[in-house]
């Protein structure tokens, strides 16, 4: 398992945000914390609750939460692909979606 606080700090710094700025950004999600709370998360003195963590992930563009905070996700179909392989797979998915041939069928409600 990866260090939660270090991971948050890394992504915050990658986004060029100060702890105080992250605290302000969280207000968009009705989450009100002080910069020292962000500091406590990053230093491991405390941890964000699930709602706070999900908002942090959204703000810091963390999309694969499992991989980012725990490690290699056994359910990730891309887990054994390098970056180029992932890119090609995503390109193919995009082509399938654009074709319209593989859309999920809409179920029309039947009123009896």
Model-based region annotation:
Residues 6-27:
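Short basic helix-loop element that most often maps to the first helix and adjoining turn
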Residues 26-48, 69-71:
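Recognition helix of helix-turn-helix/homeodomain-like DNA-binding domains
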Residues 8, 19-20, 35, 50-53:
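Helix-turn-helix DNA-binding elements, focusing on the entry/boundary residues of the two helices
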Residues 70-112:
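Interfacial/linker helices and their anchor residues that mediate assembly or domain coupling
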Residues 6, 10, 36-39, 75-76:
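Positions in alpha-helical segments
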Residues 1-3:
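A detector for short, charged/polar N-terminal pre-domain segments
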Residues 49-77:
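Short C-terminal boundary/hinge segments that cap the last helix of small helical domains
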């Amino acid at each position: 398992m990866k260090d939660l606080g270090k991971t948050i700090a890394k992504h915050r710094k990658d986004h060029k945000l100060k702890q105080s700025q992250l605290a302000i950004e969280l207000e968009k999600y009705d989450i009100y914390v002080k910069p020292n709370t962000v500091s406590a998360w990053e230093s491991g003195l405390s941890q964000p609750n699930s709602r706070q963590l999900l908002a942090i992930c959204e703000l810091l563009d963390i999309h694969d939460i499992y991989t980012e905070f725990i490690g290699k996700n056994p359910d990730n179909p891309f887990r054994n692909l390098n970056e180029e392989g992932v890119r090609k797979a995503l390109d193919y998915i995009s082509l399938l979606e654009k074709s319209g041939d593989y859309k999920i069928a809409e179920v029309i409600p039947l009123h009896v």
